[in-house]
Amino acid sequence: MTAQLIDGKAIAQTIRSTLKQKVAARIEAGKRAPGLAVILVGLDAASKIYVGSKRRACEEVGFESRSFDLDINTSEADLLALIDKCNQDPSIDGILVQLPLPEHIDDSKVIERIRPDKDVDGFHPYNVGRLAQRIPVLRPCTPLGIMTLIKSTGVDTYGLDATIVGASNIVGRPMTLELLLAGCTTTTCHRFTKNLEQKVRQADLLVVAVGKPGFILGEWIKPGAIVIDVGINRLENGSLVGDVEFDAASQHAGFITPVPGGVGPMTIACLLENTLYAAETYHDVN
């Protein structure tokens, strides 16, 4: 068996093309373009690349992109003040603060300062709580993108045994909630999990997000499983690999995401979807 590739890059481009059409229709109807504020603190190389991708994506679909590049020594108080300013700006529908932040700034305090109706990353406790209560509005971007990738396979998720490896607030925990919503029986694995191999082997659907290259052996994959590899790791030779042994896993899985070109493009596409959703649901003047 050789797995079918789930082409996140192509699916994300389709989403972006649809968004571009919707934005053009908004403007033709006399409405403004959605606005996204992107805040970067410091000069972390990986974050700069990722933020740059988000800004270019905004411009591609016709959004207004507002960029705030702050010095790494920016105080927490100054960052919170900037968020307050963006919260009050009616031309801004979404606020994104690129994580991780410098150690002297409290991530949780920053996330909670963003108004829930402008929290297009979907990290605010209000939005996570809505997802937990099965009434989601703005949903965490990476899990939302993963759900779109899973749907593209045509596989019915109801009743699937799903295993999530990694329990971060950004991916693992909200991913568990999304898969529960999708009718899966879910197992979430973390640093204290025993018998990880056994839990992976039983998974009809596997999502891995730990940031360790080749952490999941290909031979563990259940025949025909859907494998979603969220990890993106740069090796010493400069190549990018995921958290799953791709070549070996491809011999067992039914569907698998590549790295790069799988989950990453979907995260940005869903950020744009959330921003348009916020504009239409919360901020349009009727």
UniProtKB/Swiss-Prot annotation:
Q: What EC number(s) has UniProt assigned to this enzyme? A: 1.5.1.5, 3.5.4.9
* Example GO molecular function: methylenetetrahydrofolate dehydrogenase (NADP+) activity
Q: Which UniProt keywords apply?
A: Amino-acid biosynthesis, Histidine biosynthesis, Hydrolase, Methionine biosynthesis, Multifunctional enzyme, NADP, One-carbon metabolism, Oxidoreductase, Purine biosynthesis
**Which Pfam family, any one of them, does this sequence belong to?**
THF_DHG_CYH
Is NADP one of the keywords UniProt gives this record?
A: yes
Is Manganese among this UniProt entry's keywords? no
Q: What family is this? A: Belongs to the tetrahydrofolate dehydrogenase/cyclohydrolase family.
Role according to the record: Catalyzes the oxidation of 5,10-methylenetetrahydrofolate to 5,10-methenyltetrahydrofolate and then the hydrolysis of 5,10-methenyltetrahydrofolate to 10-formyltetrahydrofolate.
UniProt-recorded name of the protein:
Bifunctional protein FolD
Per the UniProt record, the lineage of the source organism begins with: Bacteria, Pseudomonadati, Pseudomonadota, Gammaproteobacteria, Alteromonadales
